[in-house]
């Protein structure tokens, strides 16, 4: 009844107008699953490979027809007839078929699209929402959103070197309340930027991209907006940064081209530590470059007891790199992006490894997104307690928030908002 009978794939467009892969899976009993694959702008060197056509006559070489063809030929031949309820077997069959350590032959975009669509079809067969199918009865924790309200770095055309400045409504009473708080801060910030003569254009993830000279200038605007919206920084709302430091780490130093500064590894650690002393920053993602393990260790030893240090490019949702981090006491949290590793099974394994080691996990979107809201379900299924899915603008971001609102409603009295407990360094205060 749950055998895979057909798989179709197509080239659709993501939120940046670039092609991506969408996959449909049909089961013997008529159940259907559809998934669209996201894409990143600042990508880690150790991520699974996103297969692009390289044909400059189509989409400037960014077409994904090769990945689409892989789904409808080799992958269909390999997993057609398999039981959709055996997710591990399906994913392992595709990984073995690819035969490379980073999914370079078939493409992580092809394999992931099928993996997620299979899970959705199996959930439909079971008559369950995806979060319940994947997470079982324990999946009931609604995550605290990391809301990206100021964009810089690779996500915006402005001088700010850090990529994201986020607010986390830890003092909200529910997910719906957290979304309301974030929206009110977002609109208050828009008014403050306008009043100060800044543009209110938004970046890839829906945050504003003002022409500000430094991280401190951006943080000051965010703090002002939290207060003006009627909330208390550090209590109702805490701050989070994504430095995306790999993007400006060159020749052994951190080169802030927008600010005109160069910082050594030790100076970078000092700078981040000082920011956390001056502002209620409880989470820093990619504060050091992806292969600067020594710098990461320095940062962890310096502020890891009081700040969540999230490895994105450092870990790339990969259990081998995460295991090294756990063994060496490097970072204390992992950012989870399904397309960094390329299958649902491997994604869940990374979350499980992190949680068993006492690391937190943050479910995340990519800068190139679609209306697919799978990560909202996965955040609840894994009880990870945190989700990073952009700002309160752009429907590709709001699709995830709206799905979380629906999930919270569906859970009813069982729903539990993570709140302050989501960040261990905050929960103990």
Swiss-Prot record:
Its cofactor is Mg(2+). Pfam families: Enolase_C, Enolase_N. The active site is at 205 (proton donor), 337 (proton acceptor). The keyword Lyase applies. Catalyzes the reversible conversion of 2-phosphoglycerate (2-PG) into phosphoenolpyruvate (PEP). It is essential for the degradation of carbohydrates via glycolysis. Pathway: Carbohydrate degradation; glycolysis; pyruvate from D-glyceraldehyde 3-phosphate: step 4/5. Keywords: Cytoplasm, Glycolysis, Lyase, Magnesium, Metal-binding, Secreted. The keyword Nucleotide-binding does not apply. NCBIfam families: eno. The lineage of its organism: Bacteria, Pseudomonadati, Pseudomonadota, Alphaproteobacteria, Hyphomicrobiales. Belongs to the enolase family. Coiled coil: none annotated. Mg(2+) binds at residues 242, 285, 312. This is Enolase. Gene3D superfamilies: Enolase-like C-terminal domain, Enolase-like, N-terminal domain. GO terms for cellular component: cell surface; extracellular region; phosphopyruvate hydratase complex. Binds a second Mg(2+) ion via substrate during catalysis. It comes from the Bacteria. GO terms for molecular function: magnesium ion binding; phosphopyruvate hydratase activity.
């Amino acid at each position: 009844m749950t055998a895979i009978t057909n798989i179709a794939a197509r080239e659709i467009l993501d939120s940046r107008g670039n092609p991506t892969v969408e996959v449909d899976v049909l089961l013997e009993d008529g159940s259907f699953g559809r998934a669209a694959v996201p894409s990143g702008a600042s990508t880690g060197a150790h991520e699974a490979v996103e297969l692009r056509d390289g044909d400059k006559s189509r989409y400037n070489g960014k077409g994904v027809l090769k990945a689409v063809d892989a789904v409808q030929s080799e992958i269909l031949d390999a997993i057609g007839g398999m039981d959709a309820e055996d997710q591990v077997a399906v994913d392992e069959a595709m990984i073995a078929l690819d035969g490379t350590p980073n999914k370079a032959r078939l493409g992580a975009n092809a394999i992931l699209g099928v993996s997620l669509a299979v899970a959705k079809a199996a959930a439909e067969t079971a008559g369950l929402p995806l979060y319940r199918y994947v997470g079982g009865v324990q999946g009931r924790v609604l995550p605290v959103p990391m809301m990206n309200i100021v964009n810089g770095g690779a996500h915006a055309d402005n001088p700010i070197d850090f990529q994201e400045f986020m607010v986390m409504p830890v003092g909200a009473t529910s997910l719906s309340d957290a979304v309301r708080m974030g929206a009110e801060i977002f609109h208050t910030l828009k008014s403050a930027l306008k009043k100060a003569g800044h543009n209110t254009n938004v970046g890839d993830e829906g945050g504003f991209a003002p022409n500000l000279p430094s991280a401190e200038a951006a943080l000051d605007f965010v703090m002002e907006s939290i207060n003006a919206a009627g909330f208390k920084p550090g209590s109702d709302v805490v701050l989070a940064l994504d430095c995306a430091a790999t993007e400006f780490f060159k020749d052994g130093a951190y080169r802030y081209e927008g600010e005109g500064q160069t910082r050594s590894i030790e100076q970078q650690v000092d700078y981040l530590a000082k920011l956390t002393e001056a502002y209620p920053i409880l989470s820093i993602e990619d504060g050091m470059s992806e292969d600067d393990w020594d710098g990461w260790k320095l940062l962890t030893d310096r502020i890891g007891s009081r700040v969540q240090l999230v490895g994105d490019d450092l870990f790339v949702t990969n259990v081998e790199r995460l295991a090294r981090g756990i063994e060496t006491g490097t970072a204390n949290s992992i950012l989870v992006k399904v397309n960094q590793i390329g299958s649902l099974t491997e994604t869940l394994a990374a979350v499980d490894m992190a949680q068993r080691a006492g690391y937190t996990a943050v479910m995340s979107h990519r800068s190139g997104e679609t209306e697919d809201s799978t990560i909202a379900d996965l955040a609840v299924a894994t009880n990870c307690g945190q989700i990073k899915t952009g700002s309160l603008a752009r429907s590709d971001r709001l699709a995830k928030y709206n799905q979380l609102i629906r999930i919270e409603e569906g859970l009813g009295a069982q729903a539990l908002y993570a709140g302050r407990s989501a960040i261990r360094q905050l929960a103990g205060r």
